[in-house]
Amino acid sequence: MTEPAENLKGIFIESDQIFQIYVKTTNSDQLVISTEVEGETFETLEIDTALQNDLLYITTGRSVGFKAFDDKLAAHKVLSVVLHIELPANKELWVNSSLASVEAQGAFSYLNLNLSGGRVNLLDFTGSGVVNTLRGAIDVETKTTKIEASSRNGSLHVATSPVSLYKLTLKSVDGSISVTQSE
Protein backbone atom coordinates (compact mmCIF):
# COMPACT_ATOMS: atom_id res chain seq x y z
CA MET A 1 0.00 0.00 0.00
CA THR A 2 1.34 3.42 -0.96
CA GLU A 3 -0.48 6.57 0.11
CA PRO A 4 0.29 10.30 0.05
CA ALA A 5 1.12 11.35 3.61
CA GLU A 6 1.46 15.12 3.54
CA ASN A 7 -1.81 15.53 5.50
CA LEU A 8 -1.08 12.72 7.97
CA LYS A 9 0.18 13.47 11.46
CA GLY A 10 1.44 9.90 11.73
CA ILE A 11 0.39 6.28 12.21
CA PHE A 12 -1.13 4.31 15.09
CA ILE A 13 -0.72 0.51 15.09
CA GLU A 14 -2.83 -1.54 17.47
CA SER A 15 -2.63 -5.31 17.13
CA ASP A 16 -1.81 -8.40 19.14
CA GLN A 17 -1.31 -10.44 15.95
CA ILE A 18 1.67 -8.55 14.52
CA PHE A 19 4.99 -10.15 15.44
CA GLN A 20 7.47 -7.54 14.16
CA ILE A 21 7.18 -3.92 13.01
CA TYR A 22 9.95 -2.22 11.02
CA VAL A 23 9.62 1.55 10.50
CA LYS A 24 12.07 3.72 8.61
CA THR A 25 11.63 7.43 7.96
CA THR A 26 12.30 8.78 4.48
CA ASN A 27 12.49 12.13 2.69
CA SER A 28 9.54 11.10 0.52
CA ASP A 29 5.99 12.41 1.04
CA GLN A 30 4.61 8.88 0.55
CA LEU A 31 3.65 6.35 3.21
CA VAL A 32 4.54 2.81 2.11
CA ILE A 33 3.29 -0.26 4.01
CA SER A 34 4.07 -3.85 3.09
CA THR A 35 3.37 -7.05 4.98
CA GLU A 36 4.78 -10.54 5.28
CA VAL A 37 2.25 -13.10 6.51
CA GLU A 38 2.99 -16.78 7.12
CA GLY A 39 1.00 -19.53 8.74
CA GLU A 40 -1.67 -22.09 8.02
CA THR A 41 -4.49 -19.53 8.20
CA PHE A 42 -2.70 -16.59 6.55
CA GLU A 43 -5.51 -16.04 4.04
CA THR A 44 -7.96 -15.17 6.84
CA LEU A 45 -5.91 -12.23 8.13
CA GLU A 46 -7.18 -8.74 7.37
CA ILE A 47 -5.12 -5.58 7.77
CA ASP A 48 -7.57 -2.74 8.34
CA THR A 49 -6.79 0.97 8.04
CA ALA A 50 -8.84 4.01 9.03
CA LEU A 51 -8.11 7.72 9.26
CA GLN A 52 -8.87 9.31 12.64
CA ASN A 53 -7.57 12.60 14.03
CA ASP A 54 -5.07 12.85 11.15
CA LEU A 55 -3.54 9.50 12.20
CA LEU A 56 -3.69 6.40 10.03
CA TYR A 57 -4.91 3.62 12.33
CA ILE A 58 -3.69 0.13 11.43
CA THR A 59 -5.38 -2.88 13.04
CA THR A 60 -5.65 -6.58 12.27
CA GLY A 61 -8.56 -8.95 12.31
CA ARG A 62 -9.87 -12.13 10.75
CA SER A 63 -12.16 -12.42 7.77
CA VAL A 64 -15.87 -12.95 8.27
CA GLY A 65 -16.65 -16.59 8.92
CA PHE A 66 -13.22 -17.47 10.34
CA LYS A 67 -13.51 -20.06 13.10
CA ALA A 68 -10.56 -20.63 15.42
CA PHE A 69 -9.25 -24.18 15.51
CA ASP A 70 -10.38 -26.23 18.48
CA ASP A 71 -8.23 -29.32 18.26
CA LYS A 72 -5.09 -30.75 19.82
CA LEU A 73 -2.87 -29.06 17.24
CA ALA A 74 -4.41 -25.57 17.56
CA ALA A 75 -1.43 -24.26 19.53
CA HIS A 76 0.85 -25.14 16.61
CA LYS A 77 -1.22 -23.30 14.02
CA VAL A 78 0.42 -19.93 14.54
CA LEU A 79 0.36 -16.86 12.36
CA SER A 80 3.41 -14.67 11.77
CA VAL A 81 2.77 -11.09 10.64
CA VAL A 82 5.57 -8.64 9.88
CA LEU A 83 4.93 -4.99 8.91
CA HIS A 84 7.44 -2.93 6.92
CA ILE A 85 6.66 0.79 6.93
CA GLU A 86 8.34 3.70 5.18
CA LEU A 87 7.09 6.88 6.83
CA PRO A 88 7.91 10.46 5.84
CA ALA A 89 10.32 12.01 8.35
CA ASN A 90 9.02 13.95 11.36
CA LYS A 91 5.70 12.12 11.70
CA GLU A 92 4.28 10.42 14.80
CA LEU A 93 4.51 6.68 15.47
CA TRP A 94 2.19 5.03 18.00
CA VAL A 95 2.18 1.27 18.70
CA ASN A 96 0.14 -0.72 21.25
CA SER A 97 0.76 -4.48 21.24
CA SER A 98 1.17 -7.41 23.58
CA LEU A 99 3.23 -9.34 20.99
CA ALA A 100 5.08 -7.03 18.59
CA SER A 101 8.69 -5.97 18.65
CA VAL A 102 9.48 -2.61 17.04
CA GLU A 103 12.55 -1.48 15.13
CA ALA A 104 12.40 2.19 14.14
CA GLN A 105 15.01 4.24 12.35
CA GLY A 106 15.11 7.95 11.61
CA ALA A 107 13.48 11.24 12.63
CA PHE A 108 10.07 11.24 14.31
CA SER A 109 8.06 14.17 15.67
CA TYR A 110 6.79 11.91 18.47
CA LEU A 111 7.05 8.24 19.38
CA ASN A 112 4.77 6.31 21.76
CA LEU A 113 5.37 2.56 22.09
CA ASN A 114 3.52 0.36 24.60
CA LEU A 115 4.62 -3.27 24.30
CA SER A 116 4.23 -6.29 26.57
CA GLY A 117 6.45 -9.05 25.21
CA GLY A 118 8.27 -7.30 22.40
CA ARG A 119 11.57 -5.49 22.39
CA VAL A 120 12.37 -2.02 21.03
CA ASN A 121 15.34 -1.08 18.87
CA LEU A 122 15.64 2.59 17.87
CA LEU A 123 18.42 3.26 15.36
CA ASP A 124 19.78 6.69 14.44
CA PHE A 125 16.73 7.97 16.32
CA THR A 126 15.79 11.63 16.47
CA GLY A 127 12.70 12.85 18.30
CA SER A 128 10.82 12.88 21.57
CA GLY A 129 8.57 10.24 23.03
CA VAL A 130 7.72 7.50 25.49
CA VAL A 131 8.61 3.80 25.34
CA ASN A 132 7.09 1.28 27.77
CA THR A 133 7.75 -2.47 27.77
CA LEU A 134 6.80 -5.20 30.18
CA ARG A 135 9.40 -7.87 29.31
CA GLY A 136 11.19 -6.53 26.24
CA ALA A 137 14.59 -4.89 26.19
CA ILE A 138 14.97 -1.32 24.91
CA ASP A 139 18.03 -0.37 22.82
CA VAL A 140 18.41 3.22 21.59
CA GLU A 141 21.00 4.86 19.35
CA THR A 142 20.38 8.62 19.35
CA LYS A 143 21.98 12.04 19.70
CA THR A 144 21.09 15.30 21.43
CA THR A 145 18.38 13.57 23.48
CA LYS A 146 17.69 13.83 27.19
CA ILE A 147 16.96 10.31 28.44
CA GLU A 148 14.88 9.33 31.46
CA ALA A 149 15.21 5.57 31.92
CA SER A 150 14.00 3.11 34.54
CA SER A 151 13.74 -0.66 34.73
CA ARG A 152 12.51 -2.51 37.78
CA ASN A 153 14.36 -5.79 37.13
CA GLY A 154 16.59 -5.10 34.13
CA SER A 155 19.96 -3.40 33.81
CA LEU A 156 20.49 0.23 32.76
CA HIS A 157 23.32 1.47 30.51
CA VAL A 158 22.42 5.04 29.56
CA ALA A 159 24.75 7.55 27.91
CA THR A 160 23.86 11.21 28.36
CA SER A 161 24.19 14.06 25.90
CA PRO A 162 25.48 17.56 26.79
CA VAL A 163 22.94 19.03 24.34
CA SER A 164 19.29 18.04 24.74
CA LEU A 165 16.99 18.98 21.88
CA TYR A 166 14.60 16.07 22.54
CA LYS A 167 13.32 14.09 25.52
CA LEU A 168 12.80 10.32 25.52
CA THR A 169 11.29 8.47 28.49
CA LEU A 170 12.10 4.74 28.61
CA LYS A 171 10.46 2.36 31.10
CA SER A 172 10.53 -1.43 31.43
CA VAL A 173 9.51 -3.85 34.15
CA ASP A 174 11.79 -6.80 33.29
CA GLY A 175 13.71 -5.59 30.23
CA SER A 176 17.17 -4.05 30.18
CA ILE A 177 17.69 -0.57 28.73
CA SER A 178 20.74 0.51 26.72
CA VAL A 179 21.24 3.99 25.23
CA THR A 180 24.17 5.25 23.16
CA GLN A 181 24.51 8.88 22.09
CA SER A 182 26.45 9.65 18.92
CA GLU A 183 28.03 13.01 18.23
Region locations from a protein language model:
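Intrinsically disordered, low-complexity terminal regions
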Residues: M1-E183
